[in-house]
Amino acid sequence: TVQTNNVNTEETRAISATEVSQTTALELEQTTQTQELTELVTEEGTIWNQQKAKQLGQYMETWGQERNQNYQAYQPGHSVAFYTIQVPDDLLSYEPKIQPAIGNNPIWLNWSETGSEGGYCLVAVYSDSATQVAQKHVYLFTLVNGEAKVYVSKEQPAEEQPYLFLKETSNTELKEQFTNLVNNL
């Protein structure tokens, strides 16, 4: 009888451990699914997200090919040499290495994964600078108070002026594509 009790106790412990393990695994799976759903809802509820960034990348690849240009994406920590500066790294922060300006008005860019910060939210950078020898382009995709704006620079910054002069792109197709992505159209 003592031996039978020991076996039953061991079986009970084994069953209990298995049940606890299964319950814990189920709770963990439910928690993970809840977190993933929350992240998806949160990302989809933002003005800019990874899905939109991916769609912009696909568009820029096609758009560049149509113009015999090769555009690559850049972000903080992975900049492109645009003439004498590194974009976007040299343009970001309260005291950037070189000040971005629209016309003669300096602006301050903030890198943003969601586009929900204030000011000029830089959500994407594309340039053909790594593959172009002559005329280089850098496109800054920004959200200004929720409005999609695409700025371009084709000029080498002058050494005597610490500015990278930007202007809104005149390419209607590019502006519309970015606006449609931002507005989920």
Give the residues covered by each predicted segment.
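Mature extracytoplasmic domains of secretory-pathway proteins
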Residues: Q58, G64-H137
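Aromatic-enriched hydrophobic runs in primary sequence
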Residues: T32-T34, T38-E44, A53, R67-N68, ...
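N-terminal, intrinsically disordered, polar/charged segments of Gram-positive cell-envelope systems
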Residues: T1-E66
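Extracytoplasmic electrostatic interaction patches
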Residues: N105-L185
